[in-house]
Amino acid sequence: MQLVEEGKIGLQDAAKKYVPEIADMMVLDGFDAQGAPSVRPPKSDITVSQLLLHTAGFGYDFFNHDLFRYGAAKIVPSVVSASMASMRSVLMHDPGTAWEYGSNVDWVGKVVEAVRGKRLGEVMQERIFNPLGMSDSGFAMSPSMRARRASMHARSPEGGMSAMSDFELTQEPEQHMGGHGLYATIGDYMKFVRMALNDGTGTDGARVLKSETIDQMTVNSLGDMKIKMLPGAIPSLSNGAEFFPGMPKSWGYTWMINDQQAPTGRPAGAVAWASLANLYHWIDRKNQVGGMWGTQILPFVDGLSVPGYLVFEKVVYDHLD
């Protein structure tokens, strides 16, 4: 969005203008009787806007059974490999025709790199982390960060929990993925939340986005589309995921938007999202409040973490003046 402000990219630009290889993506058209996938060219070009809104067609294998099946048939590495090969999987639908949460924002990262001429981590350090004082954020851990790293834990079907001692993302990723892969602290991420609450300005006064850009990022840009439930296609990574089931939700240029007041007290128009290891945050510009619940537990939508997060949020709203 900083590049949009600067006039260096347009939201309706074809993404291939900046990342030519995205034009090679194909659409999954089903599987034959032997289970072999069939693909076809997309009916239109992918735009920058569609990537930001998760309507370009990219998915995540742990949220889509057909994409997981395709990856198994074609030996496509998981996105956690932070590889270009994982990003070149297949589209789940024609661009602009449906909402599908996936590696769309990873491709946004490639657009940013192409325009800035730098790796995404360097751009984020210069233009987000340093101005906001986020000294514990990055795609690789400093010695200080490593000394304080919380271990990933796995929840068993019986409810027990054990540390995953060998679970660590590569410290030299082939790709800096725009949609995942950062290390950070809750304190650092709350500086980002405060920036959004402060209309683009950090707590020390550094402006990273214009207030009108924050406005644009926090309103529905999906039109009549609504976001959908995310199936848990890889049980070790995610359960089925839907926030406030049955309540209409839309999407802006960064976050999910609840279109009605949530049971916690979060008002219509507030934004929120989550990360796979059961990290959840929300931003309520109307009431000038936001929060984050953070764990290092898999699979996503943990049966204890989600209720705890919702109780936490409700307590916040119950005590607002």
Regions found by a protein language model. Name each.
Residues 17-265:
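Short, surface-exposed loop or secondary-structure junction motifs
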Residues 264-272:
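Short, hydrophobic/aromatic-rich segments at coil-to-beta transitions
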Residues 275-277:
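Short, small/polar residue-rich loop motifs at catalytic or cofactor-binding pockets
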Residues 280-282, 288-298:
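Short, well-ordered beta-strand elements
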Residues 298-308:
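A short acidic/glycine-rich loop-to-helix N-cap element
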Residues 306-321:
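Surface-exposed amphipathic alpha-helical segments
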